């Protein structure tokens, strides 16, 4: 039965994708905040 390894691999892949997306989103948000802050100063 080869199901568990494949499902685990897929889960890790999805998890890594989600983390990567979240990090990119966070960096973009941070850049936006920095720009806004610089504009106010």
From Swiss-Prot:
UniProt subcellular location: Secreted
Domain of life: Eukaryota
One GO term describing the cellular component: extracellular region
Keyword Glycoprotein tagged: no
PROSITE patterns found in the cross-reference section: CRF
Keywords: Amidation, Hormone, Secreted
Cross-referenced Gene3D superfamilies: 6.10.250.1920
Record-linked InterPro entries: Corticotropin-releasing_fac_CS (IPR018446), CRF (IPR000187), Urocortin_CRF (IPR003620)
Valine amide: modified positions: 41
Principal cellular location given in the protein's record: secreted
GO molecular function: hormone activity
Pfam families per the UniProt record, alphabetical: CRF
Functional description taken from the UniProt entry: Urotensin is found in the teleost caudal neurosecretory system. It has a suggested role in osmoregulation and as a corticotropin-releasing factor.
Family of the protein in this entry: Belongs to the sauvagine/corticotropin-releasing factor/urotensin I family.
Protein name: Urotensin-1
Originating species: Catostomus commersonii
């Amino acid at each position: 039965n080869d199901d568990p390894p494949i499902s685990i691999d897929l889960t890790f892949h999805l998890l890594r994708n989600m983390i990567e997306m979240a990090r990119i989103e966070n960096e973009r948000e941070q850049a936006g905040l920095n720009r806004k802050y610089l504009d106010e100063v």
